[in-house]
From Swiss-Prot:
Species of origin: Aliivibrio fischeri (strain ATCC 700601 / ES114)
Subunit annotation: Heterotetramer of two alpha chains (FadJ) and two beta chains (FadI).
Protein name per the record: 3-ketoacyl-CoA thiolase
Catalytic activity: an acyl-CoA + acetyl-CoA = a 3-oxoacyl-CoA + CoA
The protein's annotated pathway: Lipid metabolism; fatty acid beta-oxidation
EC number: 2.3.1.16
């Protein structure tokens, strides 16, 4: 255990018998930009694709799966419990427990943590965690006025009563209402927050564009070098006329100069956040198979790695709302009994280049550590040679509930390629939430 961490906060994640919690395997769908390859595929079907592929990949007996914890951020009213629908749609035992959770962009970190805790408690032996989201198949709502009028219409008896109610509606009342993109409590959008963070922390347009270019360049190289293919299934979405086996947002010919041509997306006059230095709306799903180290050995599996620790944070939503990684990471490191310098890899969710670079700054800020974290000093400066080495969400895309699982799979596989070590996954999330998870590979 590193001398620079608080040993009193060390919390090993093991079962009562002392077994670590293993990630046996993981797989995901390709990530597709909104309204492209998965334009008619709802989140529940993306989740089914990923989980069925995971079951096929591991050849696990479906009867051995005790629980599925799955998440989705953009809810489908017709299938609110996506986890149970996945159980029913993938050939699992009908008695398999399943429940759904949502923690915005950190959702599949939460589903993973929930399965880990259930295994630790001994309430289950084997679980599947993950998440899926569609930004193409959206729950389009109606105005409050139209909703109340439709309800009243259902109770009328005469044509005259119906016509009288319909006359009260304006064109504005009958216009469709898309899902909200702003915080319910403040009305501030993620993009507006990214702009605020860029201005508050001195993140320039050039720095943001450079990070986006780096993300695409590294992701393109990872695909070209064959590092990603084995964790991505080939998907045949309805109507089964085409297939997809790669992420279609990555710029394989990324040119830094081209990023400067885009106009700011949120602050049109003074802004620096653009569509190119932000992660795009994306469709996709991802899933992980977890069990105790002992159970994995009994079944003949060689784990990808282990969950060493996790932590979640919550901060104010009015200012620096996407600074969650800077709050959650110190807690996760303490619980793992390590320091930042002990890490082999660091993978931070790139919601926006501005948010990512702001967090990178705060990791190294003693002032931030003292004023906001109550710590004597910063956790340290990030070694960029360890940071998002295969690219990040700006390149791969961001199906909200699937991103955490994508990061876990990718980091564990890269650690294994490098001969083992410790990895950090961390993400910001709407509502001022943050997540951090330490992974271990021998």
């Amino acid at each position: 255990m590193s001398n620079s961490v608080n040993s009193s906060k060390y919390q090993p994640l093991t079962t009562r018998q002392g077994d670590r919690i293993a990630v046996v395997s993981g797989i995901r769908t390709p990530f597709a930009k909104q309204s492209t390859a998965f334009s008619t595929t709802p989140a529940v079907d993306l989740g089914k694709l990923a989980v069925k592929a995971l079951m096929d990949k591991t050849d696990i007996d479906p009867k051995l799966i005790d629980q599925v914890v799955f998440g989705q951020v953009v809810q489908m009213p017709e299938a609110p419990n996506i986890a149970r629908e996945i159980v029913l749609g993938t050939g699992m035992n009908i008695g398999t427990d399943a429940y759904s959770v949502t923690r915005a962009c950190a959702t599949s970190f939460q589903t993973t943590a929930n399965v880990v805790e259930s295994i630790m408690a001994g309430t289950i032996d084997i679980g599947i965690a993950g998440g899926a989201d569609s930004s193409s198949v959206l729950p389009i709502g109606v105005s409050k006025k139209l909703a109340s009028t439709l309800l009243a219409l259902s109770k009328t008896k005469t044509v005259y009563q119906k016509l009288s109610l319909l006359r009260t509606l304006s064109l504005k009342d009958i216009a469709p209402v898309p899902p909200a993109v702003a915080e319910y409590s403040t009305g501030i959008s993620m993009g507006q927050t990214a702009e605020q963070m860029a201005k508050s922390h001195g993140i320039t347009r050039e720095e943001q564009d450079a990070l986006a270019h780096r993300s695409h360049t590294l992701a393109a190289k990872a695909w070209k070098d064959g590092l990603i293919q084995d964790e991505v299934m080939t998907a045949f979405p309805e109507p089964y006329t085409a297939w997809l086996d790669h992420d279609n947002n990555i710029r394989h010919d990324s040119d830094l100069a081209s990023y400067a041509k885009l106009r700011p997306a949120f602050d049109h006059k003074y802004g620096s956040v653009t569509a190119a230095n932000s992660t795009p709306l994306t469709d996709g799903g991802a899933a992980l198979l977890l069990m105790s180290e002992k159970r994995a050995k009994e079944l003949g599996y060689e784990p990808l790695g282990y969950i060493r620790s996790f932590a979640f944070s919550a901060i104010d939503v009015h200012h620096d709302m996407l600074m969650g990684p800077s709050y959650a990471t110190p807690m996760a490191l303490d619980k793992a009994g390590i320091s930042l310098s002990d890490l082999t890899l660091i993978d931070m969710h790139e919601a926006f280049a501005a948010q990512t670079l702001s967090n990178v700054k705060m990791f190294a800020s003693n002032k931030f550590a003292k004023e906001y974290l109550g710590r004597d000093k910063a956790i340290g400066e990030i070694d960029m040679e360890k940071f998002n080495v295969l690219g990040g969400s700006i390149a791969y895309g961001h199906p909200f509930a699937a991103t955490g699982a994508r990061m876990i799979i990718q980091t564990l596989r890269e650690l294994k390629r490098r001969g083992g070590g410790l990895g950090l996954n961390t993400a910001c999330a709407a509502g001022g939430l943050g997540a951090a998870m330490v992974l271990e590979v021998e």
